UniProtKB/Swiss-Prot annotation:
InterPro entries: FA_synthesis (IPR003664), Phospholipid_synth_PlsX-like (IPR012281). The gene is plsX. Belongs to the PlsX family. HAMAP family: PlsX. Its EC number is 2.3.1.274. This is Phosphate acyltransferase. Disulfide bonds: none annotated.
Amino acid sequence: MGSTCVRIAIDAMGGDHAPNEIVAGAVRASEELGVKVLLVGDPQQIASALPPKTNLERVEIVPAEEAIAMDEEPLNAVRRKRKASINVAMDLVKREQADAIFSAGHSGAAMASALLRLGRLPGVDRPAIGTVFPTIKAGKPVLILDVGANVDCRPKFLEQFAVIGSIYSQYVLGTGEPPKVGLLNIGEEDTKGNELALRTHQLLKDNPNINFIGNAEGRDVLSGEFDVIVCDGFVGNILLKFAEAIGGVILQILREELPQGLHGQIGTAILKPNLTRIKQRMDHAEHGGALLLGVSGVCLIGHGSSQAPSVFNAIRMAKEAVDNQVMQQLQSQYEILHSASD
């Protein structure tokens, strides 16, 4: 992108803390990251949420008449509410008035809107939500997909997730060539798992474009032995939310187990830098969002409970994706691999 200002469309009405926290994180990103944020939603609510002295050169309010609630059926809502904030924001990307989009609202609605407006990459049947997990090996994250876009999957969907994930891991996360791919399963043996796992295992094993090293059990997810792990969105979403919770549990236990009184205060002061680093490695707010991989546009999906720090980090991820030409890399590499397999 060079010196061009990256433009991020923000679904300001999506999420549990919208629009206040969404706007706060977006404005901070405009100030610290040099991006232009297009806040899509109710103009009055967004304007009321803007901090004093906001630089309006990098912040623009784009009106949207409606919003999609978390309890609505996503596809019907996206089709019925054409002027919903997620649709208006997605249209900005489609018309190339924005370079990327972020939403902390209904993830199903975000995916449906992306599919209807941006379309899929050639050869991709279903996009997947991919999120990066920290591992016990510092600086060696693992990409997990799908973590919620598709609760029911066919074996070929998981095979495509593995290909897309491998490209993203290699060209964006900078892992070694080729990335090591695992299939989330209940055992290491080839014969373990349900029908989906067994059939997917064979597809991954037979695909020359995937460096499949075998099944990954739950205990292997954070081991650092895998660069990419694929699963259906039902299992992946449970895994994601468990991982988000366990970080907070560990930190709470550490705080409770530190001695009380003067010795405890001294110990806490000594350990504070370590605890901060642990929190940064484990807190989902540090990562901000997950990419919707497989659609023809940079689309970041945030947690429904996202607050300003998460929004800021999601926008940072979106900017990095645009700067690193993630879509161009995914499209060109996937087309090469897809053509070779035909």
